[in-house]
Amino acid sequence: MNEDLRIYDVAIVGGGAGGIFASTISNYFNLNSILIEKKSYLGGQPMELYPNKFIYDFPCFFEIKSSDVIKKLIQQNKEQKNSNIQLDTDILNITWQTINEQELFLFETNKNSFYAKKIILASGNGSFNPRKLEINNEPIDSPFIHYSLNLETEIYKNKKILVLGGGDSAVEWANYFVEEKITNNVAIIHRRNEYRSSSFMIDCLSKNNILQKLNYEIIDFNESNKTLTIKHKETEKEQTLPFDYVLVQYGQISSPINIELLNQINKEKGKYVIDLNQKTNIKNIYAIGDATHFYCKPNTIITACAEAVRALWHISKNKKDW
């Protein structure tokens, strides 16, 4: 026990959109906070996986790139006098400690140790890696297979692009290539009959003249010929499509934070269960954003930011333990 360590009102775990905004808004509530981020940069999935993806549900913007949202959140945070952010920081352990009859969380990291009165988990899906393209349970590796859009988008100019997947990211990337006038030669291939995306973005696929192949599975990837062979799951009809690049959007495989104290938090579908005030079942621990499970809650940047405000509002109004 070290009584000389600094005590923060709030420790924010994770530097995605929700975490950055929580760090900023903590100043508004006169709470001194520290944000811990494992990577060397802020932004989470929007910066890591889809920096050029357009967002259509962010206030004051008809459309805005996710990376630009993150940049604005970071700039807003930098204007706060008491902003405290630690990058490249691994949390080694979190334990309960009692200092002067007050229960605190002791954080031990690869850089330093400190105390916190409250915790906000803004860790998203944890550390994540993209789900690889597999054929017959064998992962396919190729320089022509991409899992995120290369920022040097000139390499895609007027190229033949195949997008694999049927969720938001796959549908939005397919539209992105056409709408940004990068290339008009785009096809999207999905193993199911229906997309898992907004009706607005799905309608854009037809408006953008994107070739759509629903209910198809991948049966062959030929790197030398640059062709992808697909088979309809019902008719078993095969078709070979040429490509220059294949963009795989099969989602992510996450590795949650493995800390004994945090492992005691109730979870559903791998996410922290919260109440209306973002509280978990563990005293003084809150969770926001993609890290949480709440009935009918959309996982969007604006939702994560709103949840940051809700958690901090509750913390500021309830200074005592709950």
Swiss-Prot record:
Its cofactor is FAD. FAD binds at residues 37, 45, 50, 91, 128, 290. GO terms for molecular function: ferredoxin-NADP+ reductase activity; flavin adenine dinucleotide binding; NADP binding. InterPro entries: FAD/NAD-bd_sf, FAD/NAD-binding_dom, Fd--NADP_Rdtase_type_2, Ferredoxin-NADP_redctase_2. Binds 1 FAD per subunit. Its EC number is 1.18.1.2. Gene3D superfamilies: FAD/NAD(P)-binding domain. It catalyses: 2 reduced [2Fe-2S]-[ferredoxin] + NADP(+) + H(+) = 2 oxidized [2Fe-2S]-[ferredoxin] + NADPH. It comes from the Bacteria. Keywords: FAD, Flavoprotein, NADP, Oxidoreductase. Homodimer. Belongs to the ferredoxin--NADP reductase type 2 family. This is Ferredoxin--NADP reductase. It comes from Malacoplasma penetrans (strain HF-2) (Mycoplasma penetrans).
